[in-house]
Amino acid sequence: MKFRNNLTLYLIFIIVFTIYISLTISIPLKNGKFWHITDTHYDFMYIEGGDEDKQCREVTYKSKYEKGGASSIGNYKCDTSFELLQSSFEYMVKHEEKPDFIIWTGDDPPHLGNSQLNETLVLQSITNMTNLIKGYFPDIPIFPSIGNHDSYPQHQIGVGPNWLFENVAQLWSPFLSNDSIETFKLGGYYTELVSEGFRIISLNTVFYYNENRQCLNLTDPAGQLLWLNETLANASLAGERVWIIGHVPPGYNEKYDVFNFHKQFNDEYLFSFSQYSDIIEFHIYGHEHTDTFRLFYDDPNDHINDIEPTGIMFLSPSLTPWMNQFLPALPNNPGLRLYEYNITSFALLDYYQFWTNLTDNIISGNIDWQLEYRATEFFNTFNLSPVSMYEAYLLIQSVTSQLLKFHFYNSVSYPTKGCDEICKKIQLCSIRHPFTKGFKECLVEI
């Protein structure tokens, strides 16, 4: 009898254990997700009926009686209206209410001249956006970066301590550690250990921006690159995986035909990552308002021998549809991006690019957000690793229809006039050659 009871218990244990193992094996780990918010440029003085030639901030005779004023939804010559801003956050919450965290890469104030701004207005813009994100995503970790418009005068950010770093550090103190607050006060940069084995480094790339005159005579503003090297070295010793985030990306801006960084900073910045490409998963930036990516190498000469890249940068499009009327660039439709990553390896798996057609919205009177494309489907890749994105680049390079579609997505499906040979060269070379020398050689080769 005792033997029979023991046998019964043993069989029950085997059955339960088998069921447990089968369930464990059959149920895959859920992938992590995060929103990337960038270049919102909310204009709190945007008014319905405003004159687009006056940034939609005032009603004029022309806007009232002749040409017609701006829609309450938005205008391609103006920054983000409240209606557009509100709809974007409502859509994000509806689509993915509980992301693991939010990456927010700056540029909150509207595109205004210094005569229309001051320190108080700039800080109020950053405060408004901070409160908005926290309000829609309470208890969700936020990892921010400072942008070139998050300053006064515009684009001018020098070494701290200064009014900007001091005030923003206090504003962001609820989601930054004490160590992060200290380095932010010094230079607007920091690092956070998100979880065991997973680190985010937020860099202040405005130091190197081509319109920032405050750091031209400095070799390493606020010691950021030295600190970066030490942080990456420690991360490597600890066996951590690293993500790099910032506002202004290095390399060539295909929209404005200019390098984003001052010449002396561009290559030095890229070289800072070469020794640690084995632990850096990817970079995320904003600033250009366009949808694109950048490949880079440990050695800038590696592209000559078709060696596969060791790094990848993703540039997300802006929420603002604003068009620079003084430079040869198209506007873009508003965009939002949701990334997907492996919660074990912290590798980037995919992203979902959402958009809204501002032209149609103005006609209908409703804002309709929808999926524009899924990255792995459009690029025909398994994931978003540097090697996979190199394959995506080769597809764009070799298949004309893919290039034209990529160029269309570059401005978030805003109608373009196509992409001629010069356009093709700039698009392809800016993707593959963020180093200055390689880019110039590429323009001749293609």
Swiss-Prot record:
It comes from the Eukaryota. Its cofactor is Zn(2+). Glycans are attached at residues 6, 118, 128, 178, 217, 229, 234, 342, 357. It is an enzyme of class 3 (hydrolase). Its EC number is 3.1.4.-. One of its GO terms (biological process) is ceramide biosynthetic process. One of its GO terms (molecular function) is phosphoric diester hydrolase activity. Keywords: Disulfide bond, Glycoprotein, Glycosidase, Hydrolase, Metal-binding, Secreted, Signal, Zinc. Transmembrane segments: none annotated. Its main location: secreted. Binds 2 Zn(2+) per subunit. One of its GO terms (cellular component) is extracellular space. Residues 1-26 form the signal peptide. Disulfide bonds join 56-78, 429-442. The keyword Membrane does not apply. Zn(2+) 2 binds at residues 107, 148, 247, 287. Zn(2+) 1 binds at residues 39, 41, 107, 289. Belongs to the acid sphingomyelinase family. PANTHER family: METALLOPHOS DOMAIN-CONTAINING PROTEIN, SPHINGOMYELIN PHOSPHODIESTERASE. This is Sphingomyelinase phosphodiesterase C. It comes from Dictyostelium discoideum.
